[in-house]
C-alpha cells in the first residue's frame, strides 16, 4: 500500500475566508491543493489565505500547475541556463482567481514557495504577507555518480513573470509581519 503524504491542510475561517497551508510542493500536492480550493469554493469562500511559511519548496511542475489554478494568462516563471537559453512556463488564465488573496511567507519559504509568491506578487492578484523569503532562485539537478553518491548541480536560475531574479534576494512581502 502507498501512503499519500498530506502536504495540504485547509479550513474555512470566520467571514468565509478560506485558509490553505501548503507544507511542501510534492507530486501529491497539486491534487490536494485543487481539492481544497474546490471544497472552499463550494462552501462559499469570499477570500483566500495561502500559507507557505516554512515551506522549503519542492517539485517545479507541481508549483507551476498549482499557479495555473490562480493566475491570469501569461508567463508563470522562466528559467535561464548558463548559455542564456530561456524557457518559459505559461498559463492560459482559464482559472484566474478573482477574490481577495493573501500569501503568507517567512524567511524559511524557499524555492518553489518563492516561484509561487513571486508570481502572485508580479500579477498583483494577492498580497504577500510576512517576512522576506529565503532567496533560493536556482534550478538544481541530482547526478548519480554510480557509487552510491550523487552530485547536486545548479543548472539554471529562475525569474518571476516580471523578470525578477529571487536568487540571494528572496521575495519581499507587500506587508511585513513577523
List the predicted regions and their residue ranges:
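Contiguous effector/interaction surfaces
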Residues: 116, 159, 172-173
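Metal-dependent DNA phosphodiester-chemistry modules and their immediately adjacent helices/loops
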Residues: 111, 161-166
Amino acid at each position: 500500500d502507498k501512503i499519500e503524504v498530506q502536504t495540504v491542510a485547509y479550513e474555512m475561517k470566520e467571514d468565509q475566508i478560506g485558509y490553505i497551508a501548503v507544507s511542501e510542493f510534492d507530486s501529491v500536492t497539486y491534487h490536494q491543493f485543487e481539492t481544497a480550493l474546490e471544497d472552499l469554493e463550494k462552501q462559499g469562500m469570499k477570500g483566500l489565505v495561502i500559507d507557505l511559511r516554512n515551506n522549503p519548496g519542492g517539485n517545479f511542475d507541481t508549483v507551476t500547475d498549482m499557479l495555473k489554478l490562480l493566475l491570469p494568462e501569461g508567463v508563470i516563471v522562466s528559467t535561464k541556463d548558463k548559455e542564456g537559453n530561456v524557457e518559459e512556463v505559461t498559463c492560459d488564465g482559464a482559472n484566474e482567481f478573482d477574490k481577495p488573496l493573501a500569501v503568507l511567507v517567512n524567511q524559511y519559504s524557499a524555492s518553489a514557495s518563492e516561484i509561487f509568491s513571486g508570481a502572485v506578487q508580479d500579477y498583483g492578484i494577492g498580497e504577500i504577507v510576512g517576512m522576506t523569503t529565503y532567496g533560493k532562485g536556482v534550478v538544481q539537478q541530482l547526478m548519480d555518480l554510480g557509487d552510491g553518491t550523487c552530485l547536486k548541480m545548479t543548472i539554471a536560475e529562475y525569474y518571476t513573470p516580471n523578470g525578477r531574479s529571487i536568487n540571494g534576494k528572496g521575495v519581499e512581502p507587500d506587508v511585513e509581519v513577523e
